[in-house]
Amino acid sequence: MNKKTIWITGGSTGIGKALAIKFASKGWNVAISARRENLLKEISDNNENIHGFPLDVTDKLKCKEVFDQIKNKFQSVDICFFSTGTWNPKKEKDIDVEQIQDVFKVNFFGTLNSIKAVEEYFKNKKDGIITIVSSIAGYRGLPNSTGYGPSKSALNNLAESLYFDFKRY
């Protein structure tokens, strides 16, 4: 029987890293992606089941390229866990539109780029799981979260909308 494979974006820290270690301990092939190659290397060097694939999710073409590399390496992907995120806390007096746009580029559009990279694969396979990590900040305003909260709220809406689109597959 072939080992199962999971691809985790945001896999170098936080929830993504913890999940990578957990799945690897269960014998899964774990592909992790993040911008910081040194952290990917550190994690993969300490676990033979974890493999780093450097990625900036704001690059749509690179998302597809990395997913294709993962498919080629492991022959199949069973779960995609998209946990990429950035937070740039700001008080209302310090709100900078460009910084909020940068947060959206990573948190929302980076996740959307990742979904678009795997969409056809999972539709054709008719099997698999795509998980999007959000935050309580996506449901309720929190202090200093003028960019982060709205970007996660957009992810919540995206996930709910895609559920209806993808469930027929």
Regions found by a protein language model. Give the residues of each.
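The beta1-alpha1 cofactor-binding region of Rossmann-like NAD(H)/NADP(H)-dependent oxidoreductases
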Residues: 55-65, 97
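Substrate-binding pocket helix/loop in short-chain dehydrogenase/reductase
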Residues: 91-92, 96-104
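Conserved glycine-rich Rossmann-like NAD(P)H-binding loop of the short-chain dehydrogenase/reductase
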Residues: 26-43
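Active-site loop immediately N-terminal to the catalytic Tyr-X3-Lys motif
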Residues: 93, 140-146
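Residue(s) in the substrate-gating loop at a strand-loop-helix junction
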Residues: 135
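Conserved glycine-rich cofactor-binding loop
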Residues: 12-13
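Active-site helix of classical SDR
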Residues: 115, 151
